[in-house]
Amino acid sequence: MKNDTQEPGIPMGYEENFPPVDMKWHANATKRFASPFVDNPHDRIDVDAIILSHAAVACGWTIRDFYEKPELGIHCVCYASELYDLLPVTHWFYSLPWTRELGLKLVYKDTLPPISTGPIISEPGDVDKIRVVDKEELKKNFTQQEFYRLYDYVAKQIPMTLVPISYGFDLVGAAAELCGVENFIMWTFTEPEAAKKLVKTYTDTSVNGAAGLADKYGMAMLIVGSVLANNDIFSDESVEEYSAKMMRYYVDQSFRKGAGPQVFYHLCGNHETDYKVFKDNLIWSPFTVFHVGYKGKNVFPSKLLKEEFGSKATLMGSVDTKLMINPSPITVYNQSKEQLLGGRDAPKGYILGNSCECPPYTIPGCMHAMVKAARDFGTYGTW
């Protein structure tokens, strides 16, 4: 029997803290979500604000709760998606999956996702000490067990929102954490073979993680990005060599091992000129979403995104993440409008998103401004 006098807090049984999903809303959101992939426009252009810990904050918990209690975190995402009228599917992740298995120690913080306590190697010769972790070993270890537990919870409690997702995420950035970001950047100039081997070791481990998820659930959507590898740090040539080619390798190898066919490519940060190297390097399945955050200091224009990648994938345009904590919903609305007008007629469909993760303390009025703009300028049949 449930103890109604229990003090606020969450043991397990996270589902007891949330009302059931409104299935009328969910049915409409599902048709809307499928629109770009089945060429059957429904309702309006979708909004994917890349909600993570904001979902927990919006429901009254903390950033730390979101990451330390994945089942709670993903249920918060489910509830926040209905609250804001976003996507009908759930997700939960952080930026350093599979790194524990490679030897990195992660710690939880009150205001941050899990972060590394520091590099585990410091010399190029040490790269050989880090080995690829195979699929069966990963299945027994922390990251894969965490995802199994997470998706089993979703399958039981909110099954209509389940999409098993495996994260390669930032192949270059995660690999760089193993030796220290400053060391890694230097090695790309002085010890390029060591730097490349480190990225490949992390990538192969991530592929095995995707395969392990596909073994259990029959599929695994892939999310992979270029975050550290951007024009603020690297040349176009280096972004291509270290990131774009490895993203292709990650998707190709994951597909061959049963993952996919859904792919989300997330180019975070400044990709002012290096965006050009991705078109001919990436693998484009019929269920691909492609997203670029910034071009220089400004959000990447959806018009340019459409011109360059509209024939390749469903596109996700960007609203500047910084605006989401600025007390000016009209600014968010106007930028959303500009991006929608630039990308809404993309041949394979368009989604409106943030340039990066929705800030934990996003102003609800700013979130509403994005969705309102999508209704006002993204309703199918009105342009």
What kind of feature is each model-predicted range?
Residues 58-61, 102:
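Short, glycine/acidic-enriched capping/hinge loops at junctions between secondary-structure elements
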Residues 77-105:
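Membrane helical hairpin/interfacial module
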Residues 52-57, 96-98:
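Short active-site-proximal "capping" loops at secondary-structure junctions
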Residues 1-54, 61-64, 76, 87, ...:
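Active-site loop segments of alpha/beta catalytic cores
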Residues 95-136:
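A contiguous, low-structure linker/loop signature
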Residues 68-70:
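Ser/Thr/Asn(+Pro)-rich, low-complexity disordered segments
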